[in-house]
Amino acid sequence: MPLKWAEWRNNMQRLNKSITHAVDRPVKVMQFGEGNFLRAFVDYIFDVTNEKTDFNGGVVIVKPIEFGTLERFHDQECQYTLQLRGFVDGQPKEITRQITSVVDAVAAIEDYDKYIEYGTSETLRFIVSNTTEAGIVYDEADNDPNARPPKTYPGKLTQLLYKRYQKFNGAADKGLILLPCELIADNGIELKKCIMKFIELWGLEDGFKDWVNKYCSFCPTLVDRIVPGYPREDAAKLCEEWGYEDQLIDRAEVFGLWVVESDSNLPLEQLEKELPFKEAGLNVVFTKDHHPYKERKVRILNGSHTSFVLASFLAGNDNVENSMKDPVIRKYMEETLYNEVIPTLSLSKEDCEEFAKAVIDRFLNPFVDHRLLSISLNSVSKWEARCLPSFLGYVKKFNKLPKYLTFSIAALMSFYTSQTEAEFNGGIVLKGNRNGEEYNITDDKAVLDFFRDNSGKSPKEFTHAYLSNTKFFGGEDLSKVLDLEEVITEYITDIRERGMRAVVNDLALDD
């Protein structure tokens, strides 16, 4: 008779260094943040680099806030198992790896002295972080340079760099390379701006400011990997299969991309030499300008999501994988990507098409359940950020409307069509209707108010009201773009009369 999970846990050894055969390594990387993303992305990258090259660097994790505990890390000597699951070249792929790159985990508050000791060590060279979009902020209330530690992440970092500067008397070779992973524009530049403000606020000497400016490098980065995290439903089965208990199991997709931009203090060749990721065979791009790669990601990956998910949902699909197995929606997505988005991008066609191929594999990943309704959140602002640049770029380049991006506007308007408000999770949503089934329309109040007041009008009036609302399109009046208003009006009329499935089927057959 099989043992119950509780009995297995009692009889099972917890994952530790004796199981992983981890090698002791000098700490070269300090990582602010202990979450699933960094462990499945950055720590994985350094783990593979240790295996494939002579980098030989350990990571020390820093818990930057009071909330949470590092008990599980200490119980497992910072060892954990990572599962990468996805589609590669149209085939399922799964990789299971014991991650040994993390050598310690400390709390910036409770373990302050040890944290500072790591931050001022001879071997430290890199700092990575993922403190969320709200983490890289300047707060003048964080005004005590002697706090143990300061409250904000940039405040902590300013103090740490200052202690490092003091310990090594401003030595040029003791500067650090900072690689923030926060999802904000120009994250490295913004982090440096915050530190400069704290230097001013705290009245720190000019010598320190010069040292930061000359010998520390703040590299803007772009990260891309979907990380579902701890597999709660499968954990017991996995531990039984592996023969050890692991409370830090992490899961992510196979695809991963890190784009790292060098700064003025750090020649590109030196950055590539110090971080031998390419030698390790990893998908990391070192560049003098990360913006074209961000543009590619936003317009191809995020833009394709936004362009097809609402039409796909109204046509009867519920997640991305189903959508990709629907031949009509698959064609819709591929036509949008290859014929309407990629021609407007600054990177080479070959580079963009290779990325698009990987995106399609990611959309086919059966291990990640991308619910279309979840993706639909705030679709109006998403369309502006992700699809509008491609739409306008196409119109400018070819002097005609992009067929599928144009239809995506009509699909969005149809998805948002509702005059019924309801309370949900303490807020207000609109209630849409898909073939008799209600769904929530979630967006900012101003957006919901607009659709509540206008979506019940005639197709012509509704279309003009939406396209001429410059707040939705970055100041642009789309009602003046070629014959867009007439085309959208026809689409809205057709969708109302025949339904999304019939209209989108005809759209694909027209090619």
Task: Give the location of each predicted region.
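Substrate/ligand-engaging "lid" and interaction regions
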Residues: 4-511
